[in-house]
């Protein structure tokens, strides 16, 4: 007797025009990858346009469940010090802050979708160098931490395991959850 089980799922991918943020000429961050990757995936038939979605809104409460009010206010009011701005690696602007909020919104939606449908991804997700009180390494808000905290706070799961395959440690994520046994990084 042969038993075949097929699990069919539809991959959802968070994507927004905000993700490819304009940077100064010769900036070292490869922002264009956020336009090139989805275009290539559709071109080669890996996904269809129906797999792509534009993230919705994220509440301040979702952000403040992870980030300090002082830091988030400084981001929104564009009042980081020059040193704090340099640490992020990006020139601070209103559109950049909108981009970071949109990335986190996409990761929250992907996490919820993955819980019920198996798999989802955010083209620009993985902002794991952002700490609760500061940005670092091209990361202003920690989307992984925001999504994890959202899933736990809404009772959608009790624990989260973050498997970070980046060559650099997700130091911001590790710091945010260092005393929280509900999230393992």
Predicted regions and their residues:
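HDAC/HDAC-like amidohydrolase catalytic core signature
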Residues: 5-185
């Amino acid at each position: 007797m042969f038993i075949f089980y097929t699990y069919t799922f539809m991959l959802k991918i968070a994507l927004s025009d905000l993700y490819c943020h304009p940077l100064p000429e010769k900036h070292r961050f490869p922002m264009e990858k956020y336009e090139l990757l989805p275009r290539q995936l559709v071109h080669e038939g890996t996904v269809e346009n129906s797999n792509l979605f534009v993230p919705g809104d994220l509440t301040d409460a979702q952000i403040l469940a992870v980030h300090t009010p002082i830091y988030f206010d400084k981001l929104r009011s564009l009042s980081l010090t020059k040193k704090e701005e340099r640490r992020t690696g990006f020139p601070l602007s209103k559109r950049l802050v909108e981009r970071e909020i949109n990335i986190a919104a996409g990761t929250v939606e992907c996490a919820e979708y993955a819980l019920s449908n198996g798999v989802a991804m955010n083209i620009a997700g993985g902002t794991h160098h952002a700490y609760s009180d500061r940005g670092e390494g091209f990361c202003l808000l920690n989307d992984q931490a925001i999504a994890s905290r959202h899933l736990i706070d809404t009772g959608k799961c009790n624990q989260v395991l973050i498997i970070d395959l980046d060559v650099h440690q997700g130091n911001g994520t590790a710091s945010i959850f260092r005393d929280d046994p509900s999230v393992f990084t």
